[in-house]
């Protein structure tokens, strides 16, 4: 028989898994997602999460607790009588009472090959570190941070020009298929669980505002990885003097280039920038409040002369 599932997720990354599970015939008893957040131009409108909106389109009940500190919220969760909970980028810590609140437990779709990149930002960290491979894993959750036993895994290559946004979309697609397979195996009583290795643990800390600034004193390969690992969000950036004002410019695309100079020096008219070793060419940029533009279009509106310094 199809499983009775509670789905827990918030961003766009989670939506394909919700749709896949519903499409596979499982009964989605309820969807848990983070509460609506202020949005719009002035922050006056409350915006529902992508998962919230998807659940409403499917006529699935939606719950948005701020946390699970209230006994009533924990009791409501248990009273759904679910076979399992599926958690994909929910964004809230789950207490023991929730982890054990379904017949078979909680299963998390995590965007890395655990135990590498446990934590909040596995996609960005993998690219920023220059990894050539990552993947999706389904694990049974325990009280640790991404420490539970692994049920299924799929590896995904990270190509040299792939951005975090592109990898995000690929892993979201892979994760939906993998979780659907995991729930089918759980339904059949054939879902394996393997403890994670003790070696190779690396944590994917949340991206801080301070580290998004580009440090051109680093080698070109590291600068390139930094840029694509933060593209499109939150975006790596440098500062530039424009009409006497210091302005922050986001860089959403780059490639390794040739050339030497002082770190941050503009080497030519197509935005090759000297790094600590080698150079990177900036291929897509965005001014504050403006659109992301290819470098040639950006330069037509914002000239940056060769030999200038940026940072």
Curated annotation (Swiss-Prot):
EC number: 2.1.2.9
EC top class, as a word: transferase
Molecular-function annotations in GO: methionyl-tRNA formyltransferase activity
Pfam family, one: Formyl_trans_N
Reactions that this protein is recorded to catalyse: L-methionyl-tRNA(fMet) + (6R)-10-formyltetrahydrofolate = N-formyl-L-methionyl-tRNA(fMet) + (6S)-5,6,7,8-tetrahydrofolate + H(+)
Keyword Protein biosynthesis attached: yes
InterPro entries named among the record's database cross-references: Fmt, Formyl_trans_C, Formyl_trans_C_sf, Formyl_transf_N, Formyl_transf_N_sf, Formyl_transferase-like_C_sf, GART_AS, Met-tRNA-FMT_C
UniProt keyword terms in alphabetical order: Protein biosynthesis, Transferase
Disulfide bonds: none
Function of the protein: Attaches a formyl group to the free amino group of methionyl-tRNA(fMet). The formyl group appears to play a dual role in the initiator identity of N-formylmethionyl-tRNA by promoting its recognition by IF2 and preventing the misappropriation of this tRNA by the elongation apparatus.
HAMAP family with a match to the protein in the record: Formyl_trans
Protein name listed in UniProt: Methionyl-tRNA formyltransferase
Organism (species): Sinorhizobium medicae (strain WSM419) (Ensifer medicae)
